[in-house]
Amino acid sequence: MSTSPAARPTSNPHLLGWVDEMAKLCKPDRVHWCDGSEAEKKRLTDDAVAAKVLIPLDQQKWPGCHYHHSNPSDVARVEHLTFICTPTKEQAGPTNNWMEPKEAYRKLGAIFDGSMKGRTMYVVPYVMGPSTSPFAKVGIEITDSVYVALNMGIMARMGKVALDRLGDSNEFNRGLHSVADCNPERRFICHFPQDNTIWSVGSGYGGNALLGKKCLALRIASYLAKNEGWLAEHMLILEAESPTGEKQYVAAAFPSACGKTNFAMMIPPAAFPGWKIRTVGDDISWMRVGEDGRLWAVNPENGYFGVAPGTNRKTNPNAMDSVRKDTIFTNVARTPDGDIWWEGMDHEAPAELIDWKGQPWKKGSTEKAAHPNSRFTAPAKNNPAISPLVDDPKGVPISAIIFGGRRSTTVPLVLEAFNWTHGVYLGSTMGSETTAAATGQVGVVRRDPMAMLPFIGYDCGSYLQHWLDMQSRIPNPPKIFLVNWFRKSAEGKFLWPGYGDNMRVLKWMLDRAAGRAPAKETLLGYTPGDAGLDLHGLDVSKDAIAAATRIDLGEWEQELESQAEWFEKLGKTLPAPLALQRELLLERVRAARKVK
């Protein structure tokens, strides 16, 4: 086994000992320590192209951009193969898969044994968060995938900067990854919160293989956050600047396919001249209490790992600008001359394409050319609307926390929580409706507390209790809101136009956070009332707005029954104050129905 010239660029005995131990287990032909330099990026990219792992795109149209086909069986996160390996099953809770830690190390160790024979082991040091921030966490990912090493170089602050931050400390996340034989039968993503360790084998896909992202920044970090008194959340962070120059910051949690990246990169409508929205982060937020008693947030990531289909100049022009250079596209469609395409792009499909499986594709085919979960990995600095505070080690002060799911009925356009506990209740019961394709039953609500269901690194009830406990730590807490852009008419049409027009709802929330907007009290929370939203220049009927904001008592009685089933699933660790919130709301709804 050889080690590359950038050999062992650290004297940290804890790190060196662990890398040697993992090399002994995986048996690579050579070890390469990543330094994060541009020269290294070029060298690794050339290696990946030579190995046909990456395909260069037309460098005139897409400078510095490359294409990657994944194995067709390896195209998404695999929740059923993702495990939380706490000492007891109760610590993982009823919403996570659990594996006993010793058994997990034994089972995965047998797959890792010799898995890197004939391959290079890349040692990828990285920092999540601005490198000088008190928020920052160091991780080391060992991987046999050059694709993963290059993606980590985009998604995190990678290389020497991480080793400098680490020094001789033993406090780093130990991440071991191997594609191995990419066999779904031998695919496991295991998290060991007590050991600050992640082992992932059998997948090269982003969320399973880029261990800094969901694995460390959410699953492991949520456990660390509980113990250390902060929050690690599946939230975008955006900066809103008013025409007068006032800047406010919000964090927002939406489950997948609910427009998180679009909201983070929103362009306000023409009716809002002078307003600017800038992106601090599009996916993950780490929040701590500042010296001023407010909640301060950083984006631990350094890039965007976005879903390509549906992204276009209308829905998200800033995302389209972000992917113009130095981006890796995974499982989209491409043309033989080095262009790319996906469903929902601005122009129609070319007559002929190479689809995401590498097969010829003709216009009119019933098969999708790009995989529905095809992705782009783009540097955050490419975003023309990035916030200048994105690298600020202090983070940004959060005025409002927003929760939102995809509900075609029941949930109104916007609600403000009565208080922190009520806000945690709204977040704990949020969710999205399944489609017929997913379950055979349309409209079944999949609860997704704080959009964190697949990402909580310990028991869900204890996680919700941690949210409640945070109230006593935050003297000046942000206001909490619930939004729903997706309510439909009886004919199945969206009632609210969404996209840039979500600025109208955001403005009301910002004004409420600043204490300068009126609100109407309802049994569900505070709403804008008839005149609270700025609707000038909006081509939507009054009836549609009324339907989008309506509170239907019959629907809410059903909703609360469904919430009871969800709370029952959480078991004995469900915080009593949340059960009480549901009971009080049920009483209010029933009393209001009797009055009617």
Swiss-Prot record:
InterPro entries documented for this protein: PEP_carboxykin_GTP_CS, PEP_carboxykinase_C, PEP_carboxykinase_GTP, PEP_carboxykinase_GTP_C, PEP_carboxykinase_GTP_N, PEP_carboxykinase_N
> Cofactor comment in the record?
Binds 1 Mn(2+) ion per subunit.
Amino acids binding substrate: 77, 205-207, 256, 373-375
- Protein keywords: Cytoplasm, Decarboxylase, Gluconeogenesis, GTP-binding, Lyase, Manganese, Metal-binding, Nucleotide-binding
Question: For the region Disordered, what residue ranges are annotated?
Answer: 362-388
Which pathway does it take part in? Carbohydrate biosynthesis; gluconeogenesis
Which cofactor names does the annotation list? Mn(2+)
Give a Gene Ontology cellular component term annotated to this protein. Answer: cytosol
Q: Where located?
A: Cytoplasm
A molecular function (GO) held by this record is: phosphoenolpyruvate carboxykinase (GTP) activity
Protein EC: 4.1.1.32
Q: Tell me the PANTHER family matching this sequence.
A: PHOSPHOENOLPYRUVATE CARBOXYKINASE (PTHR11561), PHOSPHOENOLPYRUVATE CARBOXYKINASE [GTP]-RELATED (PTHR11561:SF0)
**Which family does the entry's similarity section mention?**
Belongs to the phosphoenolpyruvate carboxykinase [GTP] family.
Q: What is this protein called?
A: Phosphoenolpyruvate carboxykinase [GTP]
Q: Which organism is it from?
A: Anaeromyxobacter dehalogenans (strain 2CP-C)
Q: Which gene encodes it?
A: pckG
